[in-house]
Design a protein with these regions (language model features):
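Domain-level signature for soluble enzymes in the chorismate/prephenate branch of the shikimate pathway
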Residues: 1-288
Length: 288
């Protein structure tokens, strides 16, 4: 079931993602919007995703925000805050890597493997066991598969999701080559604030992303966390980023879950006097 509660099921939705068909963003988007009529707007970079959102307010975006191995995508936090977009959902995708090549190639004809640097890092042990393969970084996992296919690069292999193979006419040599089998990426679903209430039911929301800064006073952060604890608000993530141009000052991005919507908003009222620049980035349904 989709994590988004749509009131207009028949209208096709346009979703901006970083990457191309067969990328992990593509796979996560189709899982999240399963059963819905969607059109992908594929962008080379995350900056271009947010540019698309600025130009057309009715769009959605699905953007990776953290990985259980690589950690947080810090720049995406900055892009989210600058954009003014609202978080209306999240999706967690298990990251599974496969190695694929042209149909006429095989292990004994391969000389080079291409993929995104993070994917290559996540397959370190596999690559170490194949020292004959020269490792070359690419901008995108599925993009590496597309390049091999479109340019008919014999002797080249791509590391990406297995779903990219049929899209680009490649054959899978081995699946599940990632070092850690418990590798997950969390994605946020974003849209313009005016569009948010059309696509979610606030009564069902139980998670919120917030950002704030704090004065340089002793114990400020612990006071904020104590207030959340008093109102039985569960902190699921905290991420600090330096504020550019303000030495040793930080923005705190936090995710919280709650059972009582009223008590959650009471907690926000209680922490507001303690914080600076408190902003609600969006309320949505927590995905397990």
């Amino acid at each position: 079931m989709s994590g988004i509660f749509l009131l207009h099921q028949t209208k096709m939705k346009k979703i901006a993602i970083q990457g191309i068909k067969g990328s992990f963003h593509d796979i996560a988007t189709h899982q999240y919007f399963k059963g819905e009529d969607i059109e992908l707007i594929c962008c080379d970079t995350f900056e271009k995703v947010f540019d698309e959102m600025r130009h057309e307010g009715s769009l959605f975006a699905l953007v990776a925000i953290e990985n259980t191995i690589a950690g947080s995508l810090l720049h995406n936090y900055e892009l989210l805050l600058e954009s003014g977009l609202t978080v209306v959902g999240e999706h967690k995708l298990q990251i599974e890597h496969s190695i694929m090549c042209l149909p006429e190639d095989d292990w004994d004809t391969l000389s080079e493997v291409n993929s995104h640097p993070v994917a290559l890092m996540q397959c370190y042990r596999f690559l170490k066991n194949h020292p004959g393969l020269r490792v070359v970084e690419d901008d995108d996992t599925a993009g590496a598969a597309e390049h091999i296919s479109s340019r008919h690069l014999k002797g080249h292999a791509a590391i990406c999701h297995k779903d990219a193979a049929p899209l680009y006419g490649l054959k899978v040599l081995e699946e599940g080559i990632q070092d850690n089998k418990h590798n997950f990426t969390r994605f946020l679903v974003l849209t313009d604030p005016w569009n948010a209430d059309l696509v979610r039911d606030a009564r069902l929301c139980n998670k919120c992303s917030l950002v704030f800064s704090l004065p340089d006073d002793e114990g400020c952060l612990s006071q904020v966390l104590s207030i959340f604890s008093f109102y039985k608000i569960n902190l699921t993530k905290i991420q600090s980023l330096p504020i550019i141009g303000r030495e040793w000052e930080y923005l705190f991005y936090i995710d919280v879950t709650y059972d009582d919507y009223v008590r959650f908003h009471q907690s926000l009222d209680a922490i507001k006097p303690l914080t600076r620049e408190l902003k609600n980035l969006g309320e949505y349904v927590a995905k397990k």
